[in-house]
Amino acid sequence: MPKPTKGPRLGGSSSHQSALLANLATSLFEHGRIKTTEPKARALRPYAEKLITHAKKGALHNRREVMKKIRDKDVVHTLFAEIGPFYADRNGGYTRIIKVENRKGDNAPMAVIELVREKTVTDEANRARRAAASQAKADERADEKADEKAEETVEETTEAPAEESTEAAAEETVEETTEAPAEESTEAAEESEAKDDTK
């Protein structure tokens, strides 16, 4: 059972809204992008995307359904000959709404609605290129981590011999100090014996 859309109708009446949306869709397909108020752009988006879906199918019945809404035959031809085949591999999301600054006179919120012209399907070469780039970044990170670990081990090894050399020097000085008094005492004892012998 068909139910009316919620909220106020654009233009006041149902017939005015359908005419307004048809004119906006005609301008969108003719120029590729239009600037309008944000509520009109939001209402136009599903309307235009359904027409593009009809154009993708391309049958005579679909063309007649579109002709009920868009009266300009040149725009319908453009829709079926150029726009529909362009979106053959894309499932929805044919339009984009971009908010712009408010209108100067009445401060109405404005938006630009445009057909999305960028290709979304990436070929195998692009996928391979992206995978190789991400792999290269991962390898660089791994190399950096390995370099950091190597530097840490080098610092530890340089610190360890320095500590050992300071410990060895301290031990040598302790040994020299203990050996020096012992040698002096033995020399003094020998001298005293020599003096005793001479007497």
Curated annotation (Swiss-Prot):
Q: Which PROSITE patterns match?
A: RIBOSOMAL_L17
Keyword entries, A-Z: Ribonucleoprotein, Ribosomal protein
Q: List the biased-composition ranges (Acidic residues).
A: 153-199
- This protein's source sits in the domain of life called Bacteria
Name any one GO molecular function. Answer: structural constituent of ribosome
Q: Which SUPFAM superfamilies match?
A: Prokaryotic ribosomal protein L17 (SSF64263)
Q: What is this protein called?
A: Large ribosomal subunit protein bL17
